[in-house]
């Protein structure tokens, strides 16, 4: 991710483009006892994974301040292709799941002007034009690259305090289906626009790792979301400040219980309801 200064608000884009963030989508059900912890349940691994996914950026070595929503999310689904009922159902399920994990108010709206999160179900034929009109991309080389190489895409914009105030997700349904990625596109892109923008092969099992074959939220993803929206974790925090706070949270009895139960809890809601 490359950032470019602006005066008042910031947009992020990955890979590349200033102050927009563009993402590409490329379990057991029992809760283990604490003595049976796997690698992703270890405190240091959780902290390192949080830094990797929340503060780092896919196409830049820059470590960013923490970004998160500090206001309710009102989402509008724009249907530019068929299967409206299915697309609405899976979107509602996953956003309700995210709301439950994070405590964020995530509310559907029929008013596109009121929405601060727009989810577009479209086709790959329309993608290049949508990158111009919905993502406001101007560089034709980037438009060509993203429209050819991306399965699904998302961006968000932040204010000067690093709070997220707007996001857009585009899912070209025919392309996503061709890659058997429709459900995982919905899960990954909508999760990333909450403030977990990076992908990393160092974090697994996770939807943020293209090599781990996780199409739906993992126990580790559940923990990262819980930490991101913990009251002590603030937008704008830098790595040096956030790491000791994360360690303190993780050592609390309440969060230790969450670590134990994460795999079980994450499987009880959202897209998993369609699979069980």
Predicted regions and their residues:
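N-terminal secretory signal peptides that target proteins for export/translocation
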Residues: 1-15
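Metalloprotease/metallohydrolase-associated module, dominated by Zn2+-dependent proteases
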Residues: 59, 143-181, 197-276
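Short, aliphatic-rich beta-strand segments
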Residues: 74-78, 169-171
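Acidic/polar N-terminal loop/beta-strand segments that form early-domain functional surfaces
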Residues: 78-80, 122
């Amino acid at each position: 991710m490359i950032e470019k200064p602006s005066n008042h608000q910031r947009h992020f884009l990955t890979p590349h483009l200033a102050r927009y963030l563009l993402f590409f989508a490329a379990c057991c059900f029992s809760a283990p006892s604490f003595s049976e912890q796997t690698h992703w349940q270890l405190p240091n691994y959780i902290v390192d994974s949080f830094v990797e996914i929340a503060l780092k950026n896919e196409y830049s070595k820059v470590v960013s301040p923490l970004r998160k929503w500090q206001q309710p999310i009102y989402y509008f689904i724009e249907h530019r292709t068929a299967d409206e009922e299915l697309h609405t159902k899976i979107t509602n399920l996953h956003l309700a799941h995210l709301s439950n994990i994070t405590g964020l108010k995530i509310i559907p709206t029929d008013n596109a002007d009121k929405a601060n999160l727009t989810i577009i179900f479209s086709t790959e034929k329309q993608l290049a034009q949508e990158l111009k009109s919905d993502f406001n991309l101007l560089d034709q080389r980037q438009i060509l690259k993203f429209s050819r190489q991306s399965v699904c895409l998302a961006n968000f914009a932040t204010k000067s305090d690093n709070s997220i105030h707007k996001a857009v997700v585009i899912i070209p349904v025919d392309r996503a289906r061709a890659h058997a990625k429709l459900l995982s596109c919905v899960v990954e892109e909508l999760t990333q626009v909450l403030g977990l923008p990076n992908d990393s092969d160092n974090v697994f099992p996770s939807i943020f790792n293209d090599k781990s074959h996780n199409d739906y939220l993992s126990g580790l993803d559940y923990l990262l979301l819980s930490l991101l929206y913990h009251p002590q974790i603030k937008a704008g925090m830098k790595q040096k400040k956030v790491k000791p706070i994360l360690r303190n949270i993780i050592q609390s009895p309440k969060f230790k219980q969450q670590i134990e139960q994460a795999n079980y809890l994450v499987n009880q809601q959202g897209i998993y309801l369609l699979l069980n």
